[in-house]
Amino acid sequence: LTTGSLAVNGNDEFKDGFGDLLPGCTAVPSDDIMALEYELSKKDVAAFIFETVQGKGVYSPSREYFAQAQELCKKYGTLMIADEIQSGMGRTGRWFAFEHFGLSPDIVTIAKALSGGFVPVGAICYRESIYNKVFSKMDRCVVHSNTFGRNTLAMTAGIAAMSVLEDEKLVENAESRGLELYE
């Protein structure tokens, strides 16, 4: 955990005891489109970060909420970030849970299942326009380097896990098994 990730976490129990976190982070209630629009209309919100399937409680906001949220993000120039740490990599019958809602986020965070649970590994995917703003020049290309990045074992585990997901059609299997559970 980082103070940045804690600052955008909606669970106050996780934040207790960590002191000052990033200022200006506001949580809005799930499925409350009016609360979201109120915050975004201030035009000082960099990003709307959401879990399609919330890790705590396995709750999913409505399809209408997500469609309206995406439109509001476009309207107010706010980035839409899908936190797929727990629900991504085929766990819901699609590569990413946001696909069930027809969403097209600007940024996607992935971890946990990315290595099949073998080693810690995470990734971030983003639009080319975001990449160009962050890493547009040679002096910016290593602006966010890290000590443990590009770990060979983690990357190998990630590639192997993705190969198994594809070769054994586990995403499709998760979808069909999920439909059986609904019946």
Please give the residue ranges for each predicted region.
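Conserved N-terminal phosphate-binding loop of PLP-dependent enzymes in the Aspartate aminotransferase
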Residues: L1-E183
